[in-house]
Amino acid sequence: MGTPVNITLGSHVWVEDPELAWISGEVTEIKGTNAKIVTANGKTVVASISSIYPKDTEAPPAGVDDMTKLAYLHEPGVLHNLDCRFALNEIYTYTGNILIAVNPFQRLPHLYSVHMMEQYKGAAFGELSPHLFAVADTSYRAMINEARSQSILVSGESGAGKTETTKMLMRYLAFMGGRSDTEGRSVEQQVLESNPVLEAFGNAKTVKNNNSSRFGKFVEIQFDKRGKISGAAIRTYLLERSRVCQVSDPERNYHCFYMLCAAPPEEAKKFKVGDPRTFHYLNQTNCYEVSNVDDAREYLETRNAMDIVGIGQEAQDAIFRVVAAILHLGNVNFIKGEEADSSKLRDDKSRYHLQTAAELLMCNEKMMEDSLCKRVIVTPDGNITKPLDPESAASNRDALAKTVYSRLFDWIVDKINSSIGQDPDAKSLIGVLDIYGFESFKINSFEQLCINLTNEKLQQHFNQHVFKMEQEEYTREEINWSYVEFVDNQDVLDLIEKKPGGIIALLDEACMFPKSTHETFAQKMYQTYKGHKRFSKPKLAQTAFTVNHYAGDVTYSAEQFLDKNKDYVVAEHQALLDASKCSFVANLFPPLPEDASKQSKFSSIGTRFKQQLQALMETLNTTEPHYIRCVKPNAVLKPGIFENDNVLNQLRCGGVLEAIRISCAGYPTKRAFDEFLDRFVMLATDVPEGSDEKSACASICNKMGLKGYQIGKTKIFLRAGQMAELDARRTEVLAGATKLIQRQIRTYLTRKEFLGQKRATIYMQKLWRAKLARKLYQNMRREAASICIQKNIRAHRARKNYTKLQASATVIQTGLRTMSARNKHRHRRRTKAAIIIQREWRRHQVHEAYKKHKKATLALQCLWRAKVARKELKNLRMAARETGALKEAKDKLEKRVEELTWRLELEKNQKADLEDAKAQEIAKLQNNLTELQEKLDEAYAAIIRDKEAAKLAIEQAPPIIKEVPVVDNTQLELLNSQNNELEVEVAKLKGKIKEFEVKCFALENDSRASVTEAEDAKSKAVEFQEIIERLHTNLSNLESENQVLRQQALAASTSVEEIGELNSLKDKVAILESENETLRRQTESAEKTMPPARVFASEKNLENEHQTKEIQATKEPRNPINVLAKQGSLTDRQQESHEVLMKCLTDERRFDNEKSVAAWIVYKALLQWRLFEAEKTNIFDRIVHKIRSSIEGQDDTRELAYWLTTSSTLLYLLQSTLKFSNTNNAASRRNRSSHATLFGRLVQGMQPSSVGLETSSGYSGMAGIPNDQQMVEAKYPALLFKQHLAAYVEKTYGMIRDKLKKEINPLLNLCIHAPRPTRAKTLRDVTKSIHLTTIAKQQASYVQWQNIVNKLEHTLTFMAENHVPSMITRKLFHQVFSYINVQLFNSLLLRRECCSVSNGEYLKMGLHELEQWCLKADDEATRSPWDELQHIRQAVMFLVSHQKTQKSLDEIAKEICPVLSIPQVYRIGTMFWDDKYGTQGLSPEVINQMRKLMTEDSANMTYPSFLLDVDSSIPFSVEDVSQSFHGGNISLSDVDPSPLLRQRSDFHFLFQTLPE
């Protein structure tokens, strides 16, 4: 494995340990060839230097992704690396291009999600973290690019996860080469669903695995030219037939037996099965159930999988009937018969099971019994029937059971292959080999020999491939490798399969002799292979032998070799089953050809297996192989347990260590020049300045005295042990440098201490001098203070005497001033009292004069009021004389009331007459309708006949231009006449209504005094309302007649040439119907404006006039020719206007006051022309087609931004104007229902928006916010047009977003990893190189990040130039920044080399560039998206944070990475490595806490993926678009149309001045 190296004191090494296989330790003493080592667990051991291996102390604590990067490639290094990665749930590791997969024994769904597949799609091998998807993608890409078939070889022992790995590989290949769901049930689906079927009949529970494959499987997936799966085939190898009859405890038989026993009661009754404990083939073990497996559910799932792979229900029943027959066959027991060496059925129970088996197989019971108890020997003289003893009969029974099951399994495989189908035109294929691993048990039999032969073959193929890869690298680096050799295992293969002389050849020879036994066979082998280095005989063994395989010695027992090797069907069994009434069973045993039956050539399992194996190897030799080695970490099948001995044994059996041996035979250590110099630059202090890296590497090796190393073009290749020698010398140099540093530090510390003491002494002297100076100064201060005190005391005494004298004088002055103030106050009081007395007296005199004046005024007023009252009395007396006139008016009113009562009675009688007339008219109309329908059917039949006649006439005669007659002009004239009469009638109604209003107003004034008359007037108003409703009914009848007339006009045409005329007539009828609708609305509006209290005066006249109008409308037909001509010219003008509008939509690409002029013109025109209310029009389709043709295939962001603004503006205008139509016809409703599923999300936005619009929303140019009266009642075409607009807004937005993503995606791939700096050439160049490297790194980093910023800036500019709504722009940048966050974050978590401190600083600098751009931009749309980068920002913050080992989980989760989930923090924490300062990552306690939390989540089925998903949805709705426009000024009154429209009179409505 490795060459012994020189071990020095203090070296860290690996030493063998009986419990842990290998354990690390430190060398404390060396004596001769032995070394004393203190291990990691504290023990002291003595080991030979040749048996220990150096340990790389600088290896990352989380291990390396590729073990070829290990400094020491040996067993303990490989084992430790796998252990470290397994502890972090990193189950995949590379060894070159070999993938090692360690079974975690727990669900890790995040590793196999579709998003994870997307990450590995197209990624270079080794670019991302190790994964089986990377192997599958590499094989797929190689097949596509090199047009060469590939193969993926999955191996490992039972329980290592081969089956699941194979499933995931096939799932990824189906993901890469699968077809769309619309192409029906795909091949890849059938291949994937074949796994449960094959597992049911080919897998069983063993000691090591609950779902062990007991057969080999090679799946060939075929691909066409496009790389899509076009076919597949499944090849199986060596089914373990003996398991059908013999099962050891605690294993189980094949799953299908237990599934059938757990089937539903009706199924179990049909197949006559029950408890598995009652069957001999199942009760040989105590294990009947598997934990966490429901056999009943598995049975149903297997039946469902059979349906998918093409096995019909009848065939399924036949299959399980055969399975049940095998179970019953095992319960048939025998005892000695009456004759010698004969046998018979033991009891009635055996008879029952025999009958049941015969019934299930549909064969003869007696014939089955004879085939089990007797044997027919064919001789030249005739057939001889020989009875069998009970033991032979039981063996014969077991042989029948094994043969039937083997044939059944082969039929299932063939059926699956035929159902899937193979592509004979396939250009290439990818084969996935799921083969049993190397096996070595306590008792090994014939199956283990075949399995191990397969592994020897595959190992030889593997060794050749590994050696080939090594040779290719040597050739690529142009080094001499001719003397590199590797050990081959051809001698073992010759020992087993060589013909003649091999073990299988001897076995076939022994099987052809009837008297051969396993003892004679074993003796033959002992004699033949005596002295063979790969063959040995165990001591005291009679039938055992040992073969030295590449993975170790295996001892086989030859006791059952002869029976297991025989591959022939007993003639009686063949005849029995061939005669079965069940076609399925008979087809399992087809009759042998006559010539084949006459041949006596021997056929054996071993020979057939060799042929299959040889065919497999030939297939593999034509493909490019890829290897996956599955490893089972422990024998208890539990997560989190890594057993070193178990794993090490599997690495040996899987050939991984053999690959390492091959690598060690050449140059196991390969390092790039810069990496080599980084590690050993301190050994090159005397390298001349200016030397290149290659020369520097050679100088280091020569200086160290290395022999046999090679210098390639980009790497240096070291022999085994030379890396350790360099590390030892490096350790010495570092130790010397350490001593030098320590000496210098001690000198520095001593001198620092001396200087400190010196400074302290000087400081103390300074303090003492300062103290003496302060004392002298204090004495001087005291003397000065004494003088100051004396001065102040003298001043105090003088001030005290002066203060006493001043106080006495002040007292005397106070008394004098007080006496003077009292005298002044007394004088003021007397003066004030006198003034008050004078004021009161004067007030009294004035009051008396006022009272006298008031009394005189009241007397004068009384006299005047009496005069006025007398005058009023005189007027009242004159009014009393007019009482007689009032009485006369009262009499007139009473007469008028009587007249109105008479009219009411008359009107009731007329109403009854009208009801009778109405009933007769309805019956008459029903008869007319029936006659018209019959005429319509006859007209359609005539049209069909005329079409055929016209075709015949066209073929037989030259074209003749004929005048097209109008067959039913009278009816069209009648239709137009009725419409005109209705218009006249409505005009007269309006006049009458005005007259009624005048009369009712006068009558209302006259009847105010009478409450009774008012109530009568109200009742009359109600009756008049009923009359109006009858008018509506008559109008509806007229519309029905119009509909009938239109159908008759359409049916009247009798020639093919009249189809165009009919279409025009349809349009004209539609126009007339719209006019009817307008008249209806006018009638309703007139009704609403007429007060109900004013309409009863002339209701009788109105009804009579309306009846008169109806009679006249039926008698005055009009000529429709002039009307149709006038309408035709109108249609041409409309078409021309439509063309101008479409031209305007295309050419009017400008914005007026940040508004799309084209959108406004289109909206205004559609509104003015009333096209939103049209039942049919093609202008909407033309607009949609124009938008679609303009954006499809468009790659210009500016162009897309323009159409995004135009379509969103038009969508908003429609959203603010249109409302649902409640009167759409049934056809429109049907059409709407057909589109409900396509635009279901948009229909909600069709309700009238509350958002206002300061523009024209009516037909007369009114402006302002549309209310319920101004909202346009849209028909179905307008509704569909709005839905199309919404769809194209979303599509255009998605195109801009995806284009920007596509542009920045390659830049993100370059930005995720910091540019690798140029390494220092020599030690003296280190300082200069670091400076230059820093500058180059900064310059390189700015380029890629600045390119991203430029792309964002350009997109923002285009959006601003075209005035895209700010909401849409903001959503766009939110999604783009979210995409940047997802891509950078996922790439960071999938690449360990990116999770470093220097790379974190590089990403931090790049993110700072994005942040600066967001802050500098004036648009608000670029400020908020910065929050979308929170995942990558927090991940970068974690990478660049210091002292990670001291941080707790709570601190990390709440302060550093609050947004990241526990799996994400765990992933980045375990992948982190410090390439700048050499510090450690998170503490083991934090790692264990996170692992515990993730384990709990996994148990709760909530284990999330650590990767982020890309959001590709449309992040806004129609309401959001409306809200975005509502936030600004949407007034369209100031938009200036183009000169082209100014010249056209039909667009003058665009220039109308809006009312104030």
Swiss-Prot record:
Key words of the record: Actin-binding, ATP-binding, Calmodulin-binding, Coiled coil, Motor protein, Myosin, Nucleotide-binding, Repeat
Domain Myosin N-terminal SH3-like: 8-57
PROSITE patterns for this protein: DILUTE, IQ, MYOSIN_MOTOR, SH3_LIKE
Stretches for region Actin-binding: 495-529, 531-554, 589-613, 613-635
Tissue expression from the record: Preferentially expressed in stems.
Effect of deleting the gene: The double mutant xif xik exhibits aberrantly enhanced organ bending, including increased gravitropic root bending. The xif xik abcb19 triple mutant has a stronger bending phenotype than the double mutant xif xik.
Name of the protein described by the UniProt record: Myosin-12
Gene label: XI-F
